Amino acid sequence: MVHLVYCDNKEKVLAKILNGSKTMIIRSASGRKIPHSRVFSNEELYFIEKGSGLISTKATVKNVQNFVKLSDEEIKDIIDKNNLKLNLSEKQKERWHKKCLCLVEFDRMEIINPMKLDHQSNMDDWLIINTIEDVVEGTSIQYNYENSKMTAFNNIK
């Protein structure tokens, strides 16, 4: 699968990815939600800065860590242990302090020719798609949440 990852423009997430100071993305929630347990090594990540409308950077998933039912202390320890790769501000640490964590480490980052996103009203900040063309203007299709559903294969407790 291919993943489209929205990057917070206020925290300059994409700039940190581009300058190499950020090599891991975090997503969290009170319960498992995208991309928890749905992203795997060697899959492709495409990055888009919120508000830009342009998909401009690509990378490959190197490693994924999924956590559930964490205590406050465990959350803090996991974030602190990985913060050299995450490069989170204190505000971001607070934002991502939730019981279910998904840490996605990536490598082979490259700048690509910008592609215009065909934005649909139901899109989340992390999309799981078959190909990047599925969300690019001129070749897009209606976003299908089937790719985001839990399956028996990735349904961990």
Specify the residue positions occupied by each region the protein language model found.
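Short, basic/aromatic beta-hairpin or loop at an interaction surface
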Residues: 1-2, 8-27
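A broad, low-specificity signal marking well-ordered, structured residues that form hydrophobic/aromatic
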Residues: 3-5, 24, 45, 101-104
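Contiguous surface segments at macromolecular interaction interfaces
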Residues: 13, 28-31, 53, 67-157
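Short glycine/proline-enriched turns and hinge-like loops at secondary-structure junctions
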Residues: 19, 38-40, 54
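A short, compositionally biased N-terminal segment around positions ~18-40 that is enriched
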Residues: 24-37
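Short coil-to-beta transition motif at edge beta-strands of beta-rich domains
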Residues: 36-47
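Short, charged beta-turn/beta-strand-edge "cap" motif at the junction between a beta-strand
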Residues: 48-54
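Short beta-strand-centered aromatic/proline hotspots
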Residues: 55-64
